């Protein structure tokens, strides 16, 4: 069975491309922004891997992933950014274990796939809670 992966982005075209390119390898769930991601997690339980864009309206990807990680430490978080700056503390987030990886956009589908597979391997068999307590941003 394919592993569940939640992708969060505020651009529909990016989400459609992810579903098209990675939908055969993973059980892909799409969220159009952080609020929808939280709603999905509250309804479906936590995901083994969450991939989020950095720059989104209202709540940025780093804040979203930090919130997810606080409630479910076993979730592997990957951040996509089209900006080279780490003003949000990207290096510290990697060192602290908050993020598994930061990838630059545009990210080739194969590189994203390999990174997700590596995150799943690094998770070392720890399954996230199927239904963690509800939380909000």
Language-model regions, residue ranges each:
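C-terminal output helix
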Residues: 104-116
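Hydrophobic/aromatic residues positioned on beta-strands within the core alpha/beta folds
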Residues: 80-82
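Active-site residues of response regulator receiver
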Residues: 9, 53
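Receiver (REC) domain active-site loop signature in two-component systems and cognate sites
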Residues: 56
């Amino acid at each position: 069975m394919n592993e569940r992966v939640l992708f969060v982005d505020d651009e529909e075209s990016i989400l459609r491309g992810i579903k098209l390119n990675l939908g055969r390898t993973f059980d892909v769930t799409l969220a159009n922004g952080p609020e929808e991601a939280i709603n999905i997690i509250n309804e479906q339980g936590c995901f083994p891997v969450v991939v989020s864009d950095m720059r989104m309206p209202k709540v940025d990807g780093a804040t979203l992933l930090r919130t997810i990680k606080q409630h479910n430490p076993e979730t592997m978080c990957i951040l996509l950014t089209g900006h080279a700056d780490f003003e949000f503390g990207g290096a510290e987030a990697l060192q602290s274990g908050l993020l598994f990886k930061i990838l630059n956009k545009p990210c080739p589908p194969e590189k994203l796939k390999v990174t997700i597979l590596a995150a799943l391997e690094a998770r070392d068999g720890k399954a996230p809670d199927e239904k963690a307590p509800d939380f909000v941003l």
